[in-house]
Amino acid sequence: MEWISHLENDDDVLEIEDYKVRKDALLIAIQVTQNAINNGTLHKALEAAFDAVTDRIVISPQDYTGVMLFGASMQSEDDGDEFDDESDTHFILKLGLPTAAQIKRLKRLAEDPDLGERFKVQEEPHLMDVFFDMNRHFINMAPNFASRRIIYITDDDTPTTNEDDINKTRVRIEDLSHLKVKVEPLLINPSEDKTFDSSKFYALVFNEDTSVEPVEAIDLKQFINKRNVLNRSLFNVKMEIGEGLVVGVRGYLLYAEQKATSTTRKAWVYTGGEKPEIAKLESQAVTIESGRSVDKADLRKTFKFGNDYVPFTEEQLTQIRYFGEPIIRILGFHNSSDFSELFIHSVRSSMFLYPTDEKLVGSIRAFSALYQSLKNKDKMALAWVIVRKGAKPILALLIPSTKEIEGLHMVFLPFTDDIRQEPKTELVSAAPELVDATKNIFTRLRMPGGFESQRYPNPRLQWHYRVVRAMALQEEVPKVPEDKTTPKYRSIDTRVGDAIEEWNKVLQSSSKRPAEDICKAEKKVKSSDAGPPSNEQMQNMVENDIVGKLTVAELRAWGAANNVEPNGSKLKKDWVEVVKKYYGK
């Protein structure tokens, strides 16, 4: 198989901060039905669309977003009681970068208490025309976007029963597919008592790869949030399974820290003129001794060797950094149990590998065979990884995923140079009765479904977005940030309040030992073979004011172990004072 390159330089791979450069156009299409108006689903859909639009403006400002309503005539804001009967397709926001005025219009619509009065619902919408309008809209507004998507929201499972209309609608959806526009249907159950029946219409018009499973209206925001930002590939490289066997894979970051200070979301602005202007920052190198400006061409990167500096040219740096072309080379296979302890030693965020036939035909089939073999045999692969030209090589484990998507998690491992010495710690064991009391608390506080990351947005990041949104839309800036990670103290008290009180009683009873017992224990410590008192023993003696019973030799041994000694005189009273001061007495 031959590696087919469609790029002038396919060795260059995007850095983590730049993995969102491919532009994405997202159109949120919402069907207006009488049922959606009556049960509030239309309100929820518009609110979710508003949140998606404002979030994308801040999170991925290079992407386009649009909002479209269909299935009803709409009353214009400017025309009083007049309805637009010419079309049942209304672009509330056309694909593009929306202005503050357009976003305010969408917000007014989402918050309108008389929303139902603004629409005249059609009994049988012409969906073939709706999908045709979407097609033309993408061609006109986002012709060169690498990613184009539609989130299609409806609660009507039978828009038509006419077989000719069903066939025409299927053709229109296929036209969108040929245009590389992906349609993601969000089919909402009409009510709590009635389930959306996809078999009546939507299973007939969408291809079998498209999910037509219905969801509840309460899941609207969660569904859209998951698809709000496109998960773009970080790199596209060859994976060498064995000599002569190479497949193409893409690497994705399933988890990437979102930062409010990303370079794509901020800019410096000059406000001293008649209107604000974007400012371009430039840096200038100067010498430390004379302060003279230096051209970039005259600079050399140097590395310190003792008291000397060793300069390198760009060519020399490139040469010493080169360890081969970008590749993921499998070195061998091991049982999963052989590497069970290595997960805690990961030196960077793991990545997710998925096959692609873009440059190497047959990659998906070969990759799937590798995945199935690793999963069925409970194996992991050890790999040598260079993800981009000039990057340092690194070792990684390739672990088959256990979820629906058949891919490999790439967990990076340290070299021997990266491993630091573990700190010397003292093993402290709790009393068995205290362990049992703690288990009782943990068992009653355990989350039924486990920890779910998607339920807890970053409070600091969301607070930043809310403030920026409010200032951009000239709204009142919120005073208090929303933090969903704040413990629910009342619920905790209801569930384990009595168990916590019992735990405190057990702790006090197990930690307060009679002075006679401590003395007996310390007598054992005084034997020549026992060594210095432990920190736990010494703290107990401080609390019971019996440090003076120790000999100077024992105090010196404890001081040497803890790197502590008196200043000046080293009499026994000085050692006792140092010990008490060390433990805050």
Swiss-Prot record:
Residues 514-537 are annotated as: Disordered. It is found in: Nucleus; Chromosome, Telomere. The keyword Nucleus applies. Keywords: ATP-binding, Chromosome, DNA damage, DNA recombination, DNA repair, DNA-binding, Helicase, Hydrolase, Nucleotide-binding, Nucleus, Telomere. Its EC number is 3.6.4.12. It comes from the Eukaryota. Residues 239-444 form the Ku domain. It holds the Pfam family Ku_N. Belongs to the ku70 family. Single-stranded DNA-dependent ATP-dependent helicase. Involved in non-homologous end joining (NHEJ) DNA double strand break repair. DNA-binding is sequence-independent but has a high affinity to nicks in double-stranded DNA and to the ends of duplex DNA. Binds to naturally occurring chromosomal ends, and therefore provides chromosomal end protection. Required also for telomere recombination to repair telomeric ends in the absence of telomerase. KU70, of the KU70/KU80 heterodimer, binds to the stem loop of TLC1, the RNA component of telomerase. Involved in telomere maintenance. PANTHER family: KU AUTOANTIGEN DNA HELICASE (PTHR12604), X-RAY REPAIR CROSS-COMPLEMENTING PROTEIN 6 (PTHR12604:SF2). This is ATP-dependent DNA helicase II subunit 1.
